[in-house]
Amino acid sequence: MRFAFFGIFWLQIFGSILFLLGFFPHKNDSTGKAMSNQFSPPAVIDQVVFVMVDALRADFVFSKSHNMPFTQSLLYNSTHGIGFSAFARSPTVTMPRLKALTTGTIPGFLDVLLNIAESDTGSSIEAQDSWVYQLNSFNKKIEFYGDDTWLKLFPSAFSKFEGTTSFFVSDYTEVDNNVTRNFDHALPSSLSHSWDALILHYLGVDHIGHLYGPSSPLLNIKLLEIDTIISRIYKYLQEYDEKTNTHSLIVLCGDHGMNEVGNHGGSSSGETTAALSLLFPSNELSHINKPILNMDDNPYSILERVEQVDVVPTICLLLGIPIPKGNMGKVLSPVTELWKDTKTAKMAALSNLFQLSLLKNPSLTTSELSTQFQDSDLNDIRLALENLQSQMVAQSSSYSLDRMLVAISILGACSILSLILFRNLYNYKELLAFAPFVVQNIIIVFSSSFIEEEHVIWYFAAVSLSLLQLLNPKTRLAGSLQLFCLSIIKRWNQTGQKYSDLRDIVDDFIAPSTFMKTILCVTSAFMPAIRSPSPINFLSSMFIAFYKLMPIISKHLNELPIIASFDYTFFVRIIWSLLLISFLSKPTFKQLRCQLSLFILLLTRLENMGLYLLYDIWQRTMPEEGTLASVMYYVAEQVAFFSLGNSNSLATVDLSQAYTGLDSYNIFAVGILLFTSVFAGALWWCLHQPKRMMDRSVKTFWIMSSISLTFLCISCFIMRHHLFVWSVFSPKLLYNASWASMYFLAKCLISTIMVRLR
């Protein structure tokens, strides 16, 4: 049976991968390069500085409540700057957004995985047309300093460069200082720089968002730093343009925004609304940056809304280089007045229209387009650009239907084979108990609203099971304690989409209170050691509590040398060593459970550590065997996943815990730590099931996850043209694939080892 089971498992893994490849096809980006056409206008800009600030939400630049006085003075009190709220299409992570900002294309959702993997070969787009390539083809020199993702995308494009690591999110100071320190060379006082294009990518804003959220006072300090940098660049170029009689452009933009927690990757208005500003030190524009009056649907979209990819044809036309072949952007209307006569401005818009038209009709000639629009004015061409762009964006998604259908057949067969294989595992009563959850899992995946608010369904299921215990006088006290715990667990973190911005227990009682954080941290850290007492376990618990509270301690005692020079990475490695030594010295069931529980606590946010105290009370009051116990432990794993603040959106993935104990980026180490931190709650319940239930629990989880994944794939196939396919169904598919593969493997491994220990 074991060999048959693992055969089915690997067949399901194959089916899952096949479906993902069909649903998230890695786009075969155009390898052709654009050439100048008869509409190409002369250049009106001689050099450009492209300043990318990671996670720069539109309101960070345009709202008076944020600290960018110099930039705002250019936008609101001068004629030298224009600003836009740029729509960054999902997925809102760095690599796909950089592809969009350089090629004008709309990247696929699979780029999320490449963004995390940082594969050099998988990431490079040098074979694809972009404004970076076009500048190189015109023998323009480009210098780059900042996020090394650019170096992976364009390995040989820059004459001078220095990269910084983007994934080490715990640093938000040095990572930006390492960019600015190149200014003495890039912006010399002699005004004799050697570049035609300078690209700078700052990461500090993004890292502060991940660590502390957009409401942190650190954000305004960082924004002022960015504003000072923009001021320095602007004044340098102003002086340079005056001396050399040239014209320069500064592009200040974000690759994406961030939500109210500080994360990104999803499709909320905060994540998809990025800043885009064009600053002209020696040119003036008549455009007035008027705030949008009705911002009810998007409070972050302060100025005129445009597609983020619109910056690509704008840069190309201003610099007099061909627009990338696969571009789907349209030139920003206000800049066309830089061509002083209307005829040339019209030619610039026609050049963009011709490039977009070739995507739809490759056989189109310039003469045909010229004839079609010979009597049209500039506004007519702009309208045609808008309509054509809308059509091309709508057609940008492609699927491999054959792969998807074959994969669904394989996954369906795996589900049926699993039911046949374990048909003797359950009696009629047990099948009846699990049936509602099978039906529930099927219903959830066919509704975008249910997927977004799935946590509500699992909370309801947990409460219902606890209420059942109130019917029996013997379990009435246990049921009451469970309901008490669940009432707090449900309100600990607001998650999902609809009510995620509402205040929760963390916001109101834990985050503002040093006392509450300290009490909950210390109590939670010592709970595993109390369950499995030994001197080394208590020492590990003490070290974990000290490590978690160190940021609080350092605020008050930072003047002490031992605090100021505290090495977090080395200290975490000491904790890891203690956990390993403790288990090897006494390899028992309780000891392994204790060490893994402590490891999970180490990778949990300080504000969430108190949840494990509630889990502990809930678990101790559960029945130790029987159908109800099996169902309750299955539901508890789901509840724990959501109660820690997770959801079916990639935006809730907390990268900050994935670097615990690391001093550099390593994909395997980060992957393991990230997986553990995301599924920490579910893993805790896996560890704390009664030993005699573990094998049965693994098989139950397998059947449930297999059926759920099969029907989710069917749902994604049916809903592939749904409005929320990328923002709702796609992240859910990635999560479910992780549940059915990585989490199941971890659960299987833990159960196999623990069952064999005494």
UniProtKB/Swiss-Prot annotation:
CDD domains cross-referenced by the UniProt entry: GPI_EPT_2
GO-annotated molecular function: CP2 mannose-ethanolamine phosphotransferase activity
InterPro entries cross-referenced by the UniProt entry: Alkaline_phosphatase_core_sf (IPR017850), Phosphodiest/P_Trfase (IPR002591), PIG-G_N (IPR037674), PIGG/GPI7 (IPR039527), PIGG/GPI7_C (IPR045687)
Keyword Heme attributed: no
SUPFAM superfamilies the UniProt entry points to: Alkaline phosphatase-like
Family to which the UniProt record says this protein belongs: Belongs to the PIGG/PIGN/PIGO family. PIGG subfamily.
Function: Ethanolamine phosphate transferase involved in glycosylphosphatidylinositol-anchor biosynthesis. Transfers ethanolamine phosphate to the GPI second mannose.
Protein known as: GPI ethanolamine phosphate transferase 2
Protein source organism: Schizosaccharomyces pombe (strain 972 / ATCC 24843)
